[in-house]
């Protein structure tokens, strides 16, 4: 049926994205790349770009996708590639001198990149401004913003949530990639957030899993994910945050991903 076909299509996209991301990670050599937070978000990116309206024509009616946990560019760029906004040649320049595709994204609407990221928490406040402008123009498009759970340690996230509730920005949808890890280790050990669900609710946001009904308030999706999902030697390991792939480790990671999708 239609839903099963959609799931199969998304799984194929994720498979392609992960293999391409591993190629890109290998190409950085001793500089390394942010693998863990990208591989926890691959499914989020694949699903998001399958429903959002994005293009390279600067259309004011386009949806805005703001990546606040901006170090997950291996997922971001490969999603833009699957969407047709980037080509393989673009990806081959990843993090090299003169590239447009750095380890943190630089805003370039031609490539569908809406926001220059890097400083955690700023993406949500930027998204609030974009959503407010759309609201004042009576536009019906959406603003999607991706946060990390570790990123929710930032005070600016909670200031932004107050603004979202105050201005009743029902055109803004927050997705939290809750992989349980941040730079220095497990999020619960660094700064225990206890119940993110209750915190978001206290700011007047609606928690949901599917976007299938209208709402008068902003919504948040908390996605429980796995750091470096699918890569056996990096999963749920703080070393996955930013690491170097040797050729041997790259080959093992490819083997793991192929095994993960075997038969699908």
Model-derived segments and spans:
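Glycine/aspartate-rich loop-and-adjacent alpha/beta segment that forms the canonical ThDP
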Residues: 199, 206, 215-264
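N-terminal capping segment at the start of a domain
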Residues: 14-31, 177-179
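A short alpha/beta connector and helix-capping loop motif
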Residues: 154-179, 222-223
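Active-site pocket-lining segment
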Residues: 170-188, 197-204
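Cofactor-binding active-site loop characterized by glycine-rich and histidine/acidic residues
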Residues: 28-29, 39-159, 165-166
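Short acidic, glycine/serine/threonine-rich loops at helix termini
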Residues: 77-79, 106, 156-158, 184-188, ...
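Generic beta-sheet signal
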Residues: 63-65, 141-145, 172, 217-225
């Amino acid at each position: 049926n239609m839903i099963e076909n959609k799931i199969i299509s998304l799984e194929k996209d994720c498979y392609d994205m992960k293999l391409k991301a591993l190629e890109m990670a290998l190409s950085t050599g001793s500089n390394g790349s942010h693998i863990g937070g990208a591989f926890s978000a691959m499914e989020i990116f694949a699903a998001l770009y399958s429903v959002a309206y994005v293009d390279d024509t600067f259309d004011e009616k386009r949806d805005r996708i703001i990546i606040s946990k901006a170090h997950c560019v291996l997922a971001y760029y490969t999603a833009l590639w699957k969407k047709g906004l980037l080509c393989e040649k673009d990806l081959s320049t990843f993090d090299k001198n003169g590239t447009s595709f750095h380890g943190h994204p630089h805003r370039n609407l031609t490539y569908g990149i809406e926001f220059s990221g890097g400083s955690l928490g700023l993406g949500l406040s930027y998204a609030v401004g974009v959503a407010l402008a759309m609201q004042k123009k009576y536009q019906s498009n959406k603003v999607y913003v991706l946060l990390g759970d570790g990123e929710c340690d930032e005070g600016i996230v909670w200031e932004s949530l107050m603004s979202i509730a105050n201005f009743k920005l029902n055109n803004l949808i927050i997705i939290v990639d809750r992989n349980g890890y941040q730079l220095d280790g497990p999020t619960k050990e660094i700064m225990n957030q206890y119940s993110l669900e209750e915190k978001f609710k206290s700011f007047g946001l609606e928690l949901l899993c599917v976007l299938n009904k209208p709402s008068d308030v902003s919504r948040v999706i908390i996605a429980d994910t796995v750091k470096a999902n699918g890569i056996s030697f990096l999963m749920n390991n703080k070393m996955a945050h930013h690491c170097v792939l040797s050729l041997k480790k790259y080959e093992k990671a490819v083997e793991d991903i192929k095994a993960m999708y075997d038969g699908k």
